[in-house]
């Protein structure tokens, strides 16, 4: 059985499968055929500790990831990483997009340390930070190309990591978001600035959803959907007060949607 692990940054549960008014129709359609975990919580409200806990099955104080990987924190034992474990047990392991368990996202040495046999990740040099949703799209295209030629005789673990919905958000509000009707989540003040900020988040979520839908469509077109466990999740809450970096429900409550054939 193949495993497709799709993960986002800073999305919390602010997506349509969880009742949020977010333009994430592809994810909502997928959720209708999957298990939607409504009480999923991450092990830490910051990026690297949360991801390291999920991918090692151990708490941050056990695995050593007590802060952000790009600031010098790391796992005590990288052999505990899921990609390492699966690679030792017959899986071809593939990384496309971000990882946050070793160094910075595009650390050239990190994929091998984490246990990935193959790296598909595009260069991000041509993109400004607020344009990284386009980088996510380029990586989605690379995932799709890889799925077209995947070896049917060799199970794979493919990690597709998106920068979305991390700040800074796209500057232009997409057509799928009508800023006139956007409201920031409680307890954020409702004013012109916060409504615009929320519209930018929803725009980021829209682009994330388009990339998610593209990958799932190719998985199906390649005849692999019924041979693949698909896991969608995020690391922690949205980058807002009382959310990300906070031990509140909105800080550690995460989206977790899994489809098992």
Where are these regions (language model features)?
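Formylglycine-dependent sulfatase
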Residues: 1-261
């Amino acid at each position: 059985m193949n495993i497709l692990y799709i993960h986002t940054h800073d999305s919390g549960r602010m997506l349509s499968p969880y009742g949020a008014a977010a333009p994430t129709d592809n994810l909502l359609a997928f959720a209708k055929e999957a298990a939607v975990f409504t009480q999923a919580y991450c092990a830490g409200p910051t990026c690297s500790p949360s991801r390291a806990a999920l991918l090692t099955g151990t708490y941050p104080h056990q695995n050593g990831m007590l802060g952000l990987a790009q600031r010098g924190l790391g796992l005590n034992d990288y052999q505990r990483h899921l990609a390492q474990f699966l690679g030792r047990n017959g899986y071809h392991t593939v990384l496309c997009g971000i990882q946050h368990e070793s160094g910075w996202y595009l650390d050239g040495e990190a994929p091998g340390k984490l246990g990935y046999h193959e790296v598909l990740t595009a260069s991000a040099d041509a993109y400004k930070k607020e344009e990284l949703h386009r980088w996510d799209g380029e990586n989605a295209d690379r995932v799709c190309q890889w799925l077209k030629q995947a070896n049917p005789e060799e199970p794979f673990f493919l990690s597709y990591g998106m920068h979305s919905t991390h700040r800074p958000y796209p500057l232009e509000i997409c057509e799928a978001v009508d800023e006139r009707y956007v409201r920031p989540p409680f307890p954020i003040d409702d004013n012109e600035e916060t409504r615009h900020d929320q519209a930018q988040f929803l725009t980021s979520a829209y682009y994330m959803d388009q990339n998610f839908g593209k990958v799932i469509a190719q998985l199906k077109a390649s005849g692999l959907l019924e041979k693949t466990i698909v896991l969608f999740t995020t690391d922690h809450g949205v980058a807002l007060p009382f959310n990300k970096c906070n031990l509140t429900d909105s800080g550690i409550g995460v989206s977790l949607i899994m489809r098992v054939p």
